[in-house]
Amino acid sequence: MKELPAYLYQIPYSLLNYEKFRYKMHPFRILKASVFLLILYFLFRIFLYSVFFEKAVQVVVSTQEEPIPILQETHTFIHSVYYYPVSKSLGQNAIAMVTTMNKRTVPTITDLTINMIGTNRTARWKKEATLTTEHLLNDRCDYLLITAQTNLLENMRTLEIEAEGVMMEIPFKKAKYHAPKPVVFCVSPQFAAEQWQTFLVQYHISKRYGAHLQLYIVSMVESYYKLISEYEKLGLVSVEPWLTIKFSETDGPFLEPNRNVELRNQAAAHTDCLLMYKEAVSFVGVLDMDDILIPNNAESYYEEFEREYSGSWIISALSYGKLDFHTIKVAGLEDQSISAIVKNARRLPTKDTGKSFFRPERMNSTWSHYSRNSDKQPIYLAPTQSEPFYMERKIVKYNGMFHLKKMDWVNLTDVRDGSIPVNPGDNITQLISEAHLAEIDSDLRRMLSMEQISQLSSTLPKDDYYMPIVFKCYNESFYHIRDTAFLYNDITCVNAFSCELPQRDDLPCIHSDATYHSGPKMWPITYHYASDAFFSSDIGCYQ
């Protein structure tokens, strides 16, 4: 029988003859080798991990587990808490809380978190709220604006703060989702306010160009307040009492907050206003009562702001410089003329720190001049973007704020016709057109002719009493330091709470007040808040 070639033999693959064909590529041998190589691979990965990353892992773990050292027990005042069912920048069911907090509670106050508990009809959630501030952490002022933010439940009914098992319920309110106009101006808290002419200029010019005024008042001459109240009754302005910080119940000494916070914590008032309107308007501005903004080559603030943003995603805010002007004022309410105030204005050689106007979805808090949290923040516009852009303020070059720095009393017979000054930004165009000025004056006369307003004329201040006192105190406290370029934030806390304001019986004032509440003692922070705010005629013109 002829012998067949060896390569034609059928090779029986089985475990029984595995040894017989030891150098062949047997499937079981392939499987065994693969398992062996996988084991080697994972052992090698473990070896590399232990050699090169062990120390880094130990550092991360120790950092996470190490508690934040508590420096002292402190007190915090809660100004407001807002709830957002939906927010463009805060997300769904968001909570934002505005506080004045002692930064020396821990080494770095923004490292601290607050436990918040939200409850609705069916659930109860506990989450940590993160803290941010608009102030510099090396500021000399011990108390700062601190904003706490987290996201909780839909249809939330109650909100509590918790620390080591101790809980405190705090009131909250829903943010606005509708506003009278697409632009809102947040006016700094007024105290010992008596120059009512600035309100008339601010309101009627802002109205012409499409902004709603949100006012905050600490104290004010009573007749001036009554004038503003008539505008408020007509829905033309909104007014909020800005409260003096008080800790109604404490079990030991504490650092007095009003003397150790920057300028009555104006930043907290501006942040409160931003959070109140952030879902309701297209633009928010922060300014003082005597900061007048007039659009340049635009019919409205909205038109100018949209033009300046130009669709950019990296502009955090529009910054307008403040140019100082010296002008006149007259005593009679029926004799008021914004045309006369504008046409008799003369530019002073000085200027002041500018103010900002911004899209509210681009920031969740603000300082008195701009948002330090939003400026220079990284932003990614596409998933494929490897390096971020950085948000920054845009300095508006062709417009500036008409700052009513100084207003002198004059007799009506001494008012000159004058002429419209040039725009303080470009120094070429007119500050305002004759047609717009005539339109504003017509609206002013219409309002002042209303019986409920015209009857206030005899009661309004006809001389300056508080303004010179406040200016002198401010100058002695910090203006002269600032003007000589020696005002450093880590050396001087810009505060004038110690200013002495002598009261006059013939010049009664209203002052903000409320029912103050203190929560249970908590570690390391005990919380305080106020409810049912109102204006009292029994306190006087104080800060």
Name each region found by the language model:
Residues 211-220, 239-243:
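Short beta-strand/loop segment that forms part of the nucleotide-sugar
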